Amino acid sequence: NFRCGYCHNPQFVDEEQIKNIRTENIPEEVFFKFLEKRKGKLEGVCISGGEPTIQADLLEFALKIKQAGFLVKLDTNGTKSLVLEKMIAEKAVDFFAMDIKTSLSRYEEIVGAGFSVEEIKKSKEIIQNSGLPYEFRTTAVKGKHTREVFEEIGEWLKGAETYFIQNFRNKKTLAEEYKKEEGFSEKELVEFKLLMKKYVKNCGIRM
């Protein structure tokens, strides 16, 4: 439900690519048979996307995974706070990872789609106060993420437990223009990390 130009999963956003995925769907029973065989080897399942909270059967699916004896990690962009509340109430999730695209004032520039800033703010609060382990994370893109932007993100996330800065990769993107962009150097990312450590308890880098 977002259209970030640098999205690394364009197959879940572009309509033509989505059609191809639909023809390759794995039946649910096949998925759960696979999990059954992996008991004792796998600890959990990550439900990602795209945006999993827009799927009507997410709660039911996550509960089935839990009932099968596995932990559930949910990746989200925070646009469906009510879904997050239901997942927590039903004990259908064990870990959250929420994408923080940019500072609140710059979201529209990045996501290129209709969204509610209030929903994103609410989701952040729900996750942070859920009592469950979580991480917030931002993919850093040159020209989009600067020291000023990270200062604003830091003010918003102040007191958060865990935050990761993920380096942009140009191998696969939604918009062609981003295929020409390069990621930040490790030195530049470390500078962002040091800045963010003023605001969050734990900050890491993913190259």
Region roles according to the model:
Residues 15-18, 164, 207:
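Secondary-structure transition/capping residues
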Residues 50:
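Short, charge-patterned binding micro-sites
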Residues 30-44, 53-189:
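Conserved AdoMet/S-adenosylmethionine-binding subsite of the radical SAM
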Residues 186-207:
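Charged phosphate-binding loop/patch that engages nucleotide di/tri-phosphates or the phosphate backbone
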Residues 1-25:
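Canonical Radical SAM [4Fe-4S] cluster-binding loop centered on the CxxxCxxC motif
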